[in-house]
Amino acid sequence: MAKLVSKTYGEALFDLALENQSLDIIEEEIKAVKMVFNENTELIKFLNHPKITKEEKVAFVENIFKGRVSDDVTGFLVIIIKKGRYDEISGIFDYFLAKVREHKNIGVAYVTSAVEISEQEKEQIKDKLLATTKYVQFEMNYKVDASILGGLIIRIGDRVVDSSLKSKLNTLSKNLFKIQLG
């Protein structure tokens, strides 16, 4: 159910942004609003508090965001509150931002390495991904995990390329085990 709510509201915001030709502006505003929600857990507690009326919640959110973000984004937040969907707000924002990336043909890559990767290597990885995928740009996320021993693991969406030494050793071990049994 939660994913359906996120999709429904995220699509509505995306369509509104396209219709008003304000996709870039709304994208930046949603990123900023999302950051406010992520950094202020008290705001989430306030919105989820059962004894605070929807009207009080709407007034509070309007007080925070009106004049700081567009009327479209403020109005969207008000609708979410009036419909009682504030507990889905993070999922709605994530869906909207994913939809924007899809529209702009921007991929998101998660790269795991055993050691820190230099800036030059990061550029080479990004260039290789751009050359071998349909994306025109990438949001790159790097993580160091010494347990993979060496190589890289690259995840883009639901696709994973695992060229880690750990994976290769596991495969070799399985193959040797099969030979011993055969």
UniProtKB/Swiss-Prot annotation:
One of its GO terms (molecular function) is proton-transporting ATP synthase activity, rotational mechanism. It is a peripheral membrane protein. InterPro entries: ATP_synth_OSCP/delta_N_sf, ATPase_OSCP/dsu. It comes from the Bacteria. SUPFAM superfamilies: N-terminal domain of the delta subunit of the F1F0-ATP synthase (SSF47928). The keyword Translocase does not apply. GO terms for cellular component: plasma membrane; proton-transporting ATP synthase complex. Coiled coil: none annotated. Keywords: ATP synthesis, Cell membrane, CF(1), Hydrogen ion transport, Ion transport, Membrane, Transport. It is found in: Cell membrane. Its main location: membrane. The keyword Coiled coil does not apply. F(1)F(0) ATP synthase produces ATP from ADP in the presence of a proton or sodium gradient. F-type ATPases consist of two structural domains, F(1) containing the extramembraneous catalytic core and F(0) containing the membrane proton channel, linked together by a central stalk and a peripheral stalk. During catalysis, ATP synthesis in the catalytic domain of F(1) is coupled via a rotary mechanism of the central stalk subunits to proton translocation. F-type ATPases have 2 components, F(1) - the catalytic core - and F(0) - the membrane proton channel. F(1) has five subunits: alpha(3), beta(3), gamma(1), delta(1), epsilon(1). F(0) has three main subunits: a(1), b(2) and c(10-14). The alpha and beta chains form an alternating ring which encloses part of the gamma chain. F(1) is attached to F(0) by a central stalk formed by the gamma and epsilon chains, while a peripheral stalk is formed by the delta and b chains. Belongs to the ATPase delta chain family. This is ATP synthase subunit delta. It comes from Lachnoclostridium phytofermentans (strain ATCC 700394 / DSM 18823 / ISDg) (Clostridium phytofermentans). The gene is atpH.
